[in-house]
């Protein structure tokens, strides 16, 4: 009985904690400060600038082209000199872009995977064609590869002529286009995990198999992007090509940009606009095709 009384006294002496209804506290996520304004304003500003810089000039070309009668349009683009100019631009731009794809990828590989004296200098020199005026590049290349030039004089002794030939056009397009491939492939190679290559080597794969099965699928979309940019740039290139091609209709070294300029000089605006539209459509189809190939490659890699 005494024990029961002591127990009751302890219970009465113990303070009772009265818990009220639990409050549901919602933690609001702290908003990170935005460097740019909201989506609506940003999108509006971006579309406005894009319209002024890109869409409006392209729309102007389309508007002028639609005003040309179909018969006059076909007559402007069906001339032999125009066909030869398009054939020259397409073939030389494609060959130059293919060369840039191969050697640009090799150059990016060397700059990323190896450390050697002068690597930073070479990496900076790659962007020189972006900063150098194309006319200056064309004059320099024409002097260098002329019959009295440093390289041209040696090549002439071997029976090889560079200036005023399609080979000279390709060299000029390689010069202006190689930065596109290098700068497209270089970041992908830098982020590529080397453990996959080590795993392939441990499993007994040779270097060619490792490159074909592991490295190539990863860098292929970036390489195609650089190829497309170099190809599209080569189609409309003027300054670096005009001094080394010779612009001979007989030798078929006239490019599309030169023929367009000639038509503008002779006040043939319909002919120039028609050629500009065809060139614009070709460049768009090339870029669209490469983008679709990149998307397909990315989906294939994502489904592995």
Model-predicted regions and their roles:
Residues 33-34, 95-126, 139, 143, ...:
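Transmembrane-helix boundary motif in ABC transporter permease subunits
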Residues 36, 73, 80, 238-289:
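Interhelical loop and adjacent transmembrane-helix boundary motif
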Residues 44-49, 128, 175-193, 207-240, ...:
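Transmembrane alpha-helices
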Residues 86, 111, 128, 195-203, ...:
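Short hydrophobic faces within alpha-helices
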Residues 30-40, 61-98, 113-114, 262-270:
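Periplasmic/extracellular loop-to-transmembrane helix junction in inner-membrane transport proteins
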Residues 12-18, 41-45, 56, 60, ...:
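C-terminal transmembrane helix and the adjacent membrane-cytosol boundary/short C-terminal tail
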Residues 52, 87, 91-103, 107, ...:
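Hydrophobic alpha-helical transmembrane segments of multipass integral membrane proteins
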Residues 29-34, 70-78, 83, 118-119, ...:
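Membrane-interfacial helix termini and adjacent extracytoplasmic/periplasmic loops
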């Amino acid at each position: 009985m005494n024990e029961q009384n002591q127990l009751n006294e302890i219970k009465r002496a113990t303070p009772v904690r009265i818990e009220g209804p639990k409050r549901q506290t919602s933690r609001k996520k702290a908003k990170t400060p935005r460097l740019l304004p909201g989506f609506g304003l940003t999108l509006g500003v971006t579309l406005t600038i894009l319209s002024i810089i890109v869409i409006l000039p392209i729309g102007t070309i389309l508007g002028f082209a639609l005003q040309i009668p179909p018969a006059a349009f076909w007559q402007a683009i069906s001339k032999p000199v125009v066909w030869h100019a398009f054939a020259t631009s397409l073939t030389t731009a494609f060959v130059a872009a293919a060369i840039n794809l191969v050697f640009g990828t090799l150059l990016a590989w060397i700059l990323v995977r190896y450390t050697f004296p002068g690597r930073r200098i070479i990496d900076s020199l790659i962007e020189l064609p972006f900063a150098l005026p194309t006319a200056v590049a064309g004059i320099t290349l024409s002097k260098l590869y002329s019959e009295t030039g440093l390289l041209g004089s040696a090549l002439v002794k071997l029976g090889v002529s560079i200036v005023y030939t399609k080979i000279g056009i390709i060299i000029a397009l390689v010069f202006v286009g190689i930065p596109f491939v290098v700068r497209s492939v270089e970041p992908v190679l830098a982020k590529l995990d080397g453990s996959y290559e080590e795993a392939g080597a441990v499993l007994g794969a040779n270097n060619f198999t490792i490159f074909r099965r592991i490295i190539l699928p990863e860098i292929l979309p970036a390489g195609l992007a650089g190829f497309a940019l170099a190809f599209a740039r080569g189609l409309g290139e003027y300054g670096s090509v005009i001094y080394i091609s010779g612009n001979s209709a007989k030798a078929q070294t006239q490019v599309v940009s030169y023929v367009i300029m000639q038509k503008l000089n002779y006040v043939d605006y319909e002919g120039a606009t028609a050629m500009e539209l065809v060139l614009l459509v070709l460049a768009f189809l090339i870029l669209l095709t490469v983008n679709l190939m990149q998307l397909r490659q990315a989906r294939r890699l994502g489904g592995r």
